[in-house]
């Protein structure tokens, strides 16, 4: 796998380092997964190359580049190295051997020099001062101080040091990450030449248009402040009104645990000096620790980063869970609510058995029509497409990008690992097992994959109207109360050939959300007692006449302004994500990572329903978005602040995820 520099430019000071690190954590820039190979060094280890690597992800403990460097010296929070002129190393060595014993061993970074008889000690005198007429924006004082600082008082000599002019500048930051206070070691290794700085050839991150909207988080600023090397002083030359001034506290409140960046630029624009995050081509595994909920003896897949919540190019999105892939997350079997309802389920076992027969009969009918449904899977003109724009997928894998089926990525929004279900990380999901107590997985057929779809906990999902789905009208589904807020398996309807009876299944995943009560008439969640003729979006009652697909009565919404709930979105929940510090936004902790995901491209439009009413997003909590009409996102604001609302339009593929801090319309 080829690697590229994270950024092309010059790290002048800590402010620049913060911008580079934050952009990497946001997914705007990419960190590198390995050291450069020897064949890559000639074009990677050059002036202007800036590399960021995360020690826990890349496994890089020691950076090697094959260059002979002087001993390090401290400049603020940075370490500075100068490349030695190998052609003159012999003469320097000879002179040193007859001189003082105060010397330093110079290696080429590959440990080979230590075993090479021709390698010898070189006495290093103070570095020659370099005075350049640099423009203020290029940090004259900062660069000058780097050139003025001597290596060590003991290295002073009249012997001139031969070096090429290439300089290596490094910095490391220890970042503590919630929820387990794990430590990530972030490293920056940058290269520049004295000539390029003199001629103003390299741009600083502060001056880069690509990074103009990046704001270092408070956690990162604190971590940088805790990095101490020598007598540290702030070399920042940014003004108080600069777009990237990290000392502007109003601009530094965005926590690292938010998915949404404040970048207004499209993430796939190849702006000068930028490289975007690209997904790794291999799956990393590591031995997890007890704090994550896994036993020490159990292996779990390593996250790309506990801080890279979202990777912008290309993003990976799950399609329908498929029995041949690791997306069949049967969380319902471990749900506490299922256990709590076992007694009632057992009492109704006779009724369940009767319903099972109906399920089996209906499934037989459905299976007979499977081929008709799957023949046109992925075709936007398919008359059997579900009303919710979902399709039935078969075992051959009707994925948007089938050639990428083996490629795995982890778009984690939080680092919370599902501690109750290690099966999240199995390479082969467990086969559905018939459960007579809960009516789950009835009539499972190996001839066609029947996927575990999850319904919205506060919606009827047409449970009482759809063929094959059991449960009493309006108040229960699969003999479990709808208001119990648990994922329900709509197994019987997955492959129904009739779109009229296929409104239930949604290939969605849950996340825990604190749902604020909005006082807007377009609110998605209204109190039950507000079901009046003047409020068409109020939560309706649980009467039998409740319209299919609308919310049922839920006492949890009636008595609390902020109620914990589980809300389900299809694929990407980012459009509802915002800063956890913004009380007017959804506040959530993503609890269910997506183990197997597939890249999404233009053909994703084929599985979208373009007929959504523009005003329905506020009243439709099941409104599943990849990219919908721009007005949908305007309406989603529902009267509250527009900050950090994700803005996705029809012109975007998921490679073009944007946020807009000023407005959500285009």
Curated annotation (Swiss-Prot):
Subcellular location as annotated: Cytoplasm; Nucleus
Phosphoserine: residues bearing it: 152
The keyword Plastid appears for this protein: no
A GO term, aspect molecular function: DNA binding
Listed InterPro entries: Gti1/Pac2 (IPR018608)
Alphabetically ordered keywords of this record: Cytoplasm, Nucleus, Phosphoprotein
Single GO cellular component term: nucleus
Annotated stretches, region: Disordered: 90-157, 232-254, 314-389, 425-479, 528-552
Biased amino acid composition, Low complexity: 90-104, 233-254, 334-384, 460-476
Biased composition regions of type Polar residues, renumbered to the chain: 108-121, 139-157, 314-333, 436-451, 530-552
Pfam families xref list: Gti1_Pac2
Presence of keyword Disulfide bond: no
Similarity comment: family membership: Belongs to the MIT1/WOR1 family.
PANTHER family: TRANSCRIPTIONAL REGULATOR MIT1
Function: Transcriptional regulator of pseudohyphal growth.
Further comment: Present with 1710 molecules/cell in log phase SD medium.
Name assigned to this protein: Transcriptional regulator MIT1
Name of the gene encoding the protein in the UniProt record: MIT1
């Amino acid at each position: 796998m080829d690697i590229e520099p994270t950024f092309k430019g010059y790290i002048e000071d800590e402010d620049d380092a913060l911008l580079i690190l934050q952009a990497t954590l946001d997914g705007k820039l990419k960190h590198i997964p390995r050291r450069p190979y020897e064949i890559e060094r000639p074009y990677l280890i050059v002036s202007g190359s800036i590399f960021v690597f995360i020690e826990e992800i890349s496994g890089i403990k020691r950076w090697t580049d094959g260059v002979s460097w002087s001993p390090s010296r401290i400049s603020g929070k940075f370490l500075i190295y100068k490349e030695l002129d190998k052609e003159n190393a012999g003469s320097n060595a000879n002179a040193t051997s007859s001189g003082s014993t105060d010397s330093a061993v110079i290696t080429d970074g590959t440990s080979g020099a230590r075993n090479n008889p021709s390698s010898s000690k070189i006495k290093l005198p103070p570095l020659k001062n370099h005075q350049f007429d640099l423009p203020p924006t290029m940090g004259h004082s900062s660069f000058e101080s780097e050139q003025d600082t001597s290596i060590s008082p003991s290295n002073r000599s009249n012997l001139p040091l031969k070096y090429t002019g290439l300089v290596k500048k490094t910095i490391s930051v220890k970042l503590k990450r919630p929820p387990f206070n794990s430590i990530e070691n972030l490293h920056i290794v940058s290269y520049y030449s004295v000539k390029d700085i003199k001629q103003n050839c390299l741009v600083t991150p502060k001056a880069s248009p690509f990074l103009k909207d990046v704001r270092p988080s408070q956690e990162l600023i604190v971590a940088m402040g805790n990095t101490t090397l020598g007598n540290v002083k702030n070399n920042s030359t940014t003004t108080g009104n600069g777009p990237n001034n990290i000392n502007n506290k109003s601009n530094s409140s965005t926590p690292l645990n938010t998915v949404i960046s404040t970048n207004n630029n499209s993430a796939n624009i190849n702006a000068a000096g930028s490289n975007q995050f690209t997904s790794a081509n291999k799956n990393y595994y590591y031995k997890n620790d007890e704090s994550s909920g896994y036993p020490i003896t159990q292996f779990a897949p390593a996250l790309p980063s506990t801080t890279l919540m979202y990777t912008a190019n290309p993003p990976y999105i799950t399609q329908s869970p498929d029995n041949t892939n690791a997306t069949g997350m049967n969380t319902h079997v471990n749900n506490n609510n299922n256990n709590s309802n076992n007694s009632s389920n057992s009492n109704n076992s006779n009724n369940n058995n009767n319903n099972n027969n109906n399920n089996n009969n209906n499934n037989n009918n459905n299976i007979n029509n499977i081929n008709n449904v799957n023949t046109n899977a992925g075709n936007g003109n398919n008359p059997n497409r579900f009303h919710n724009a979902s399709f039935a997928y078969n075992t051959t894998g009707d994925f948007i990008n089938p050639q990428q089926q083996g490629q795995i990525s982890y778009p984690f929004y939080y680092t919370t690992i599902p501690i109750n279900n290690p099966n999240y990380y199995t390479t082969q999901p467990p086969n559905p097992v018939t459960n007579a107590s809960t009516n789950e997985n009835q009539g499972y057929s190996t001839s066609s994959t029947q996927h575990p779809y999850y319904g919205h906990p506060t919606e009827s999902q047409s449970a009482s109207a759809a063929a094959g789905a059991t449960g009493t009208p309006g108040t229960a589904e699969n003999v479990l109360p709808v208001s119990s807020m648990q994922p329900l398996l709509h197994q019987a309807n997955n492959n129904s050939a009739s779109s009229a009876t296929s409104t239930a299944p949604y290939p969605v995943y849950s996340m825990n959300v604190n749902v604020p009560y909005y006082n807007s008439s377009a609110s998605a969640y209204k109190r039950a007692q507000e079901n009046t003729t003047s409020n068409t979006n109020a939560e309706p009652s649980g009467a039998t006449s409740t319209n299919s697909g609308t919310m049922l009565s839920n006492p949890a919404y009636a008595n609390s302004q902020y109620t914990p709930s589980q809300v389900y979105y299809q694929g990407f929940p980012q459009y509802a994500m915002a800063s956890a510090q913004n009380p007017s936004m959804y506040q959530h902790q993503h609890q269910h990572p997506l183990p197997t995901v597939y890249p999404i491209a233009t053909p994703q439009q084929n599985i979208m329903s373009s007929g959504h009413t523009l005003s329905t997003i506020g009243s439709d909590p099941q409104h599943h978005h990849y990219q919908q009409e721009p007005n949908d996102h305007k309406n989603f604001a529902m009267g509250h602040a527009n900050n950090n609302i994700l803005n996705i339009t029809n012109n975007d593929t998921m490679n073009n995820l944007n946020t807009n801090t000023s407005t959500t319309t285009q």
